[in-house]
Amino acid sequence: MASTLAEFEVQWEIQKTDLKGNLIAETPRRRRRGDATEHEVINLVRYDGVRLYPGVTIVCKVEGADELSAYMIHEVRLNTSNYVELWCLNYLSWYEINAAERYKQLDGEFYETNKEKGDKFFEETFASQSIKNELYLTAELSEIYLRDLQFVANIKNEKEYLDSVNEGKMDSNMFLCRSACLPSGTNLADLDIHFFEEKIRSSNPKVSLEYLRDITLPKLPKPLNKSKVHAREKVVATKLQSDNTPSKKSFQQTVSKTNAEVQRIASTIVNEKEAISDNESDLSEYHESKEEFANASSSDSDEEFEDYQSAEELAIVEPAKKKVRSIKPDIPISPVKSQTPLQPSAVHSSPRKFFKNNIVRAKKAYTPFSKRYKNPKDIPDLNDIFQRHNNDLDIAALEERFRTVSAKGKMETIFSKVKKQLNSRNSKEEIVKAADFDNYLPARENEFASIYLSLYSAIEAGTSTSIYIAGTPGVGKTLTVREVVKDLMTSADQKELPRFQYIEINGLKIVKASDSYEVFWQKISGEKLTSGAAMESLEFYFNKVPATKKRPIVVLLDELDALVSKSQDVMYNFFNWATYSNAKLIVVAVANTLDLPERHLGNKISSRIGFTRIMFTGYTHEELRTIINLRLKYLNESSFYVDPETGSSYMISPDSSTIETDEEEKRKDFSNYKRLKLRINPDAIEIASRKIASVSGDVRRALKVVKRAVEYAENDYLKRLRYERLVNSKKDTSGNGTGNEELQSVEIKHITKALNESSTSPEQQFISGLSFSGKLFLYALINLIKKKQTDVQLGDIVEEMRLLIDVNGNNKYILELKRILFQNDSVDTKEQLRAVSWDYILLQLLDAGVVVRQYLKNERLSTIKLNISMEDAEQCLHEDEMLKTF
């Protein structure tokens, strides 16, 4: 299969067709605004005639999996990072269906009679009755690579499959699909597979995905009809093959063509069709309920707004209002029309319909979750409805585990290594010993263990808690939390711990503090509400929804300092929700200020944060040196091919082959290129780590300095290379090939140059060039900020400057400066409090963006705020020789 762009262009061709399969000619002319839009379907055509497009089912062998897996192509994307991406809907096989839940849904009497026998009994029963070639479609999306493609499947509905069995036309590529379900293998629903295939091709990807999610959402159970329950007993009357255990067999099954097998499949299809149709609403009722609700939503009464419900809930709560049509379950009829317009005027045909849809959408955005359920007992199980579409984990790092049906073995986690010692007194020491932190999280093993124990205890017990983490920027706070959550999530995927959801909210990415409600609720439920409705929904969710109907949530409030407001409502609500008994909420707050709760949050919030507080100290120079060496492990002592003409470089692997190059560059002739070896002087790393550890201990700054030093070393080499090329331009350079390896070192001078650049920002350079009066102004401003912790008035700064000069009056240099600034030789007067060129000094700082001023008629009452980092300003002022005497 195609794994590179060159192979793809040889094996595959991209075509665009209409809904009927006719090719659409590419034209450079831009379509006019009034023209009718033509729906395009992207096709991938292989050289042997295989055609892939939305709606086609493919069978793939995913890397790392033992078995084949089936997927329905949902969307073909072009011009992305992988050039062509296939986003597909996942199928489930018979052994992935939750047998107990299936019988509970379709045959309640059989389930109640045998539920004491356990899940294994239902699995064995379903294994003996199921059709091994049947697939179940889910709304879970996965990205599939063309290199994993095995063959294109032939999907049949139940009538076509039954005819094929009767006629003896079965083959290994034929599969039956008549149902959809949740990714967990529960809540089976009728599905016309061919209707859905056409819907994928003719509608927007979001529309078809939402349609599939709607029909698989759990609905409130209807009262069972006893006359129909008796008919359902036929489902378990016939047994299939001699297999009694639901072992995971090969994906392709050889179907027997005997008359007994034909009768068995026919009876199974008919009986299961009756069972499913009795328990689920058919497709026509589903669409009719949506139309009926859309028409009813045009009313502007306040009562209707308060009693708003979704289409699924309306269909459950008020079944008598629907006009139920009697149709055959074999042919589901849907009133949804194709989105391809038949006439040019069809684009503007029904503005009223779109207006009604907008009203429904607007009402839903303002309707809290609490308004949809008057009684908390009516709330369905939200474990499968919520929290299955959003998770703030590194999906790329865990991609294979999510896509693989059965892995060869479990991954080792902290829990699997020390699960017996987690509740002992030495649990923290055991966690530190269990993992090799030096290879991925050096110098943070104690903090990792503390956070792990707090999160593990809350997730395992299903309780709520709050954790406050503080430390200066760049000391590994967020990274440590993410590593802990990744390990816990791996344990949850392997069923070692209860499943939970991880959500990140960054305060710097939110415009207003109240917007965090919208972000939080959208990541929990997948729906977007306004701030007020989201806050009310969150309050209802954590306080009223029973704990058995939801999963634990771990929310990371990163950059907590940015969420602090005057009212403190946002901070209070987040920590207050964690105090509810039904919440199952774990709040991990990360801030840069050590005493933020006591200084800015107040007693009512500080008491709810609790006593679990973990402080991250700055890295020492030994720890910084270890981290730098770890990050530069593959760069130090590495080799490159360097083009003498252009200066472009290609990294060389130990086997002398280029790394991260495409096929054309791999075939390039490097005989005329220079071979360069890069070496980083250990003394240079030592100086960088010691210098940064003495200032802040910020590892990000240390890595940035070393990276910049490598760039300086590269520039020095290129300058030397250009000089040699100019000098030797008239000489024969045929002998300077790859055989002569040159050496370029990153020396102390490169580190020093990078340190000076990183420590002197444009604002710092401006402060260093200020006059003494401007520096004295900033010095007085910073002193007042440290003393008052509030806004500083201009008059207070003048008094502080005067006080500083009076205190240091014995210095002859200060006396001379006082005479120059205030133009007085002996006695001070009130008229002499204004320094010479005062407006110029203040405007100079304002224009540079160093300070911000509030303009009032009375200048002395106007507020002055520092607009840059206080640490950067103090660093520049401390370097001034005159201010060192203060």
Curated annotation (Swiss-Prot):
Keyword ATP-binding: yes
One GO cellular component term: nuclear origin of replication recognition complex
Gene this protein is translated from: ORC1
GO molecular function: ATP binding; ATP hydrolysis activity; chromatin binding; DNA replication origin binding; metal ion binding
Species per Swiss-Prot/TrEMBL record: Kluyveromyces lactis (strain ATCC 8585 / CBS 2359 / DSM 70799 / NBRC 1267 / NRRL Y-1140 / WM37)
SMART domains: AAA, BAH
Principal cellular location given in the protein's record: nucleus
UniProt keyword Nucleotide-binding, yes or no: yes
Record's protein name: Origin recognition complex subunit 1
GO biological process, alphabetically ordered: DNA replication initiation; mitotic DNA replication checkpoint signaling
Basic and acidic residues composition-biased segments: 284-293
Signal peptide boundaries: none
SUPFAM superfamilies associated with the record: BAH domain (SSF82061), P-loop containing nucleoside triphosphate hydrolases (SSF52540)
Function: Component of the origin recognition complex (ORC) that binds origins of replication. It has a role in both chromosomal replication and mating type transcriptional silencing. Binds to the ARS consensus sequence (ACS) of origins of replication in an ATP-dependent manner.
Extent of Acidic residues compositional bias: 300-309
